């Protein structure tokens, strides 16, 4: 396996290299959960590396190349376990007369062809004004609405697409005292707080039931969009201005619902380390692969700081396990 750099600790492993090449070194059925955000079909270009899937020549070529990655994730995933894909539909352009490409639907159909079973779609609400400021999309301008609202669109949601590998899950993901943590912007009602960690009948556990109602909703309007890991130091001068890590609330919910403590959580597109950080913070072993050296270096910095002072990582971010799956010496 060819990697540019790597760091392996008791709780996490990070590899600077091509995820396709790295996954070849992972045994079958060795991962309990994968959660990640792939490039959005060439909407943004993350590097000039020809191995970067964001550099595909067409939308169709992106889906074809992405299918190779999704197929290998299926190979390394344990039966009955989950892969969770963060994505969004993408515009055909920014002329003010554009249409949307059904990326989420194409990702679903591609995974089904490989053998994954489509389980759920969660919609993550986004503030239209914030989206406009970030993208300058003409279809979101009030001026466009005033001049000709037939050319207007909406601030499309992000999606978390959930797929299950065929077969039986040999280790149930149980919550014997219910869900004990809520991650999101809402405040739990005062009358349910006394049930947090309830070890009696779970039919009485009003805290866990309240949390579950938030998580079981198809529309996640309580994700804190600003709760992300630091990323500004990872940007090269030629980087586009879109860089924004996956929200930690989304990652925390996925890790809590679809893995057990001690499980291996994998991401093929590690970026600045968000998924690995979330896994380790919740007592799992995180394994991540990142092709771009500047992102990889930022991920290492975030993960090292998380080990010593996790609260500082998230505070900084708001300004915007050792695994035996790979051999440490296998680096050339």
What are these regions (language model features)?
Residues 106-107, 300-332:
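Class I S-adenosyl-L-methionine-dependent methyltransferase module
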């Amino acid at each position: 396996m060819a990697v540019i750099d790597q760091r392996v600790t008791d709780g996490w492993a990070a590899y600077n290299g091509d995820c396709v090449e790295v996954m070849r070194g992972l045994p079958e059925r060795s991962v309990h959960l994968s959660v990640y955000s792939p490039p959005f079909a060439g909407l943004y270009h993350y590097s000039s590396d020809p191995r970067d899937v964001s550099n595909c020549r067409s939308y169709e070529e992106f889906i074809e190349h992405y299918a190779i990655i999704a197929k290998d994730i299926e190979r390394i995933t344990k039966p009955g376990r989950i892969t969770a894909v963060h994505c969004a539909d993408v515009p055909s352009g920014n002329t003010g007369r554009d249409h949307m490409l059904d990326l989420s639907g194409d990702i679903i159909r591609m995974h089904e062809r490989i053998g994954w079973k489509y389980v759920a779609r969660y919609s993550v609400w986004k503030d239209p004004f914030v989206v406009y400021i970030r993208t300058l999309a003409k279809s979101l301008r009030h001026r466009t609405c005033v001049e000709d609202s037939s050319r207007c669109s909406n601030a499309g949601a992000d999606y978390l697409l959930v797929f299950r590998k065929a077969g039986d899950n040999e280790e149930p993901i149980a919550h014997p005292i219910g869900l004990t943590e809520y991650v999101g912007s809402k405040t739990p009602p005062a009358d349910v707080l006394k049930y947090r960690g309830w070890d009696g009948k779970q039919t009485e556990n009003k805290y866990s039931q309240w949390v579950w109602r938030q998580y079981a909703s198809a529309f996640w309007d309580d994700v804190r969009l600003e709760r992300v890991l630091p990323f500004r130091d990872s940007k090269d001068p030629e980087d586009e201005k879109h860089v924004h890590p996956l929200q930690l609330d989304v990652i925390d919910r996925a890790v809590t619902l679809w893995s057990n403590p001690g499980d291996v959580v994998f991401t093929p597109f590690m970026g600045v380390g968000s998924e690995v950080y979330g896994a380790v913070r919740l007592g799992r072993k995180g394994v991540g692969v990142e092709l771009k050296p500047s992102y990889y270096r930022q991920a290492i910095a975030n993960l090292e700081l998380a080990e010593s002072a996790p609260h500082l990582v998230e505070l900084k971010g708001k300004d915007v396990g050792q695994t035996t799956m790979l051999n440490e010496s296998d680096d050339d």
